[in-house]
Amino acid sequence: MSKGIVALAMSGGVDSSVSAYILKERGYDVIGIYMDLWRDERKGYCNKSAAEDARRVAEKLDIPFHVINIEKKFKDNVIDYFIDEYLSGRTPNPCVACNKTIKFEAFFNAAKEFGADFMATGHYCKIEERNGRKVIVKAEDDKKDQTYMMYNLKQYQLERTIMPCGEYKKDHIREIAENIGLDVYNKKDSQEICFIPDNDHGGFIKRNYKSKIKQGNFVDKAGKIIGKHKGIIYYTIGQRKGLGIALGKPAYVIDINPITNEVVIGDEEDIFRTELIAKDVNFIPFDKLEKSMELEAKVRYSAKPSKATIIPLENNKVKVVFQNKQRAITKGQSVVFYDKDMLVGGGIIEEIV
């Protein structure tokens, strides 16, 4: 007897491909869906090979396969957001925006239109029930854990979402793929932003919004002009390489001012801070933070969680006070909270205090 219909987001990669197999083995009726998200004007359909890989996997596993076009929503909510943030002197995380508005909103809604009871992805996270609520828990594979990107999920989404890969090590996923004869078993993991395959975000923005990129001044902490920069989009907090200025000592970007179009330069010690304000906060084990909590938090995907106090503020904001100084806290990135293995929530870094 079927456990229900699952709409699986297929990317053509090994994780979503093996997820299809696992779900089918567990008794679900799987529908494979590939999202056509964007087209590179220089190359045409940028991900044709990925779509074909996904289609071949679906044929191999004998599951229905569909391609849906979400280009406009992806452009409006991810690409335009990405560009606007850089032009505003912030460093965005497009994967967080994509999960919030595309994978777990647009795709979630598409799954319902296909008559699915659940949606599934190839993300490395676990979904469990604790104290009567669905929560997100770190994956079995610490190196592949993707909970940092998932803090925006709501209860209604978690109740209908399955992430099979969270229960496996990556090597095991590849092993399953090879054993069942999937050609994608040795396909490389994507490391770059999907719509910037050459990893040159500055070049991407320049091609699309060249007129908005303005040269400006490098200034020191006292406001003294010490050089010229080529546009604030090319810089991020903590950056040392590629500044093109010689001060006779290591120089770091410590702030970016979009109003004056200035990039502030300082010493390495200046990029270590302990406090921040985050906006657009979402919590998963509970609806609202009523009082301060002692948790662990991290300010970038690759960082280790560090002890911090999370203090509720008005307008869906929190203040985060770390026990130890954090390197290069960056506006536009996400700060994410954990209680041991459980993802508690997160928000967008708005201000460094």
UniProtKB/Swiss-Prot annotation:
Pfam family of the protein (one): tRNA_Me_trans
Entries under CDD domains matching the protein: MnmA_TRMU-like
Segments traversing the membrane: none
Key words of the record: ATP-binding, Cytoplasm, Disulfide bond, Nucleotide-binding, RNA-binding, Transferase, tRNA processing, tRNA-binding
Catalysis performed (reactions): S-sulfanyl-L-cysteinyl-[protein] + uridine(34) in tRNA + AH2 + ATP = 2-thiouridine(34) in tRNA + L-cysteinyl-[protein] + A + AMP + diphosphate + H(+)
Active-site residues from the entry: 98, 194
GO terms assigned for molecular function: ATP binding; tRNA binding; tRNA-uridine 2-sulfurtransferase activity
Site (Interaction with tRNA) location in chain: 123, 333
Enzyme Commission number(s) of this protein: 2.8.1.13
GO cellular component, one term: cytoplasm
Binding sites annotated in the UniProt record for ATP: 9-16, 35, 122
Highest taxon of source: Bacteria
Function in brief: Catalyzes the 2-thiolation of uridine at the wobble position (U34) of tRNA, leading to the formation of s(2)U34.
Protein name: tRNA-specific 2-thiouridylase MnmA 2
Gene, per the UniProt record: mnmA2
